[in-house]
Amino acid sequence: MAERKIRIRLKAYEYRTIDASAAKIVETAKRTGAQVVGPIPLPTERTIYTILRSPHKHKDSREQFEMRTHKRLIDLVNPTDKTVDSLRKLDLPAGVAIEIKL
């Protein structure tokens, strides 16, 4: 029998919220009887924006802003129907983007 696998990718700007969400997902999956691989930390994506401080001139005076996107990967091996139902009902913070592949 081929093993079923659900791959969950999490993205967030704050690492605390993504770690808390990953812990909730792992705890729910283990409680319902699925094997869990992860959470695996993926490379953090850094986006840097450079802007002029002055609206018209002084090109030498610039300011840089940075946006970091933290990512985690969780694999659920052989999930039961109960696992899928519990993950659907799970309440996660608003700042976490979830991508699920079956």
UniProtKB/Swiss-Prot annotation:
Mind listing the GO molecular function terms for this protein? structural constituent of ribosome; tRNA binding
Instruction: Give the CC-aspect GO terms.
Output: ribonucleoprotein complex; ribosome
What family is this protein classified in?
Answer: Belongs to the universal ribosomal protein uS10 family.
The record ties this protein, via HAMAP family, to:
Ribosomal_uS10 (MF_00508)
Function, as annotated = Involved in the binding of tRNA to the ribosomes.
InterPro entries hit by this protein: Ribosomal_uS10, Ribosomal_uS10_CS, Ribosomal_uS10_dom, Ribosomal_uS10_dom_sf
Superkingdom of this entry's organism?
A: Bacteria
> What PROSITE patterns does the record point to?
RIBOSOMAL_S10 (PS00361)
**What UniProt keywords are attached to this protein's entry?**
Ribonucleoprotein, Ribosomal protein
- What name is this protein filed under? Small ribosomal subunit protein uS10
SUPFAM superfamilies the record matches: Ribosomal protein S10
Q: Which organism is it from?
A: Oenococcus oeni (strain ATCC BAA-331 / PSU-1)
Q: How does it assemble?
A: Part of the 30S ribosomal subunit.
UniProt-listed GO biological process terms: translation
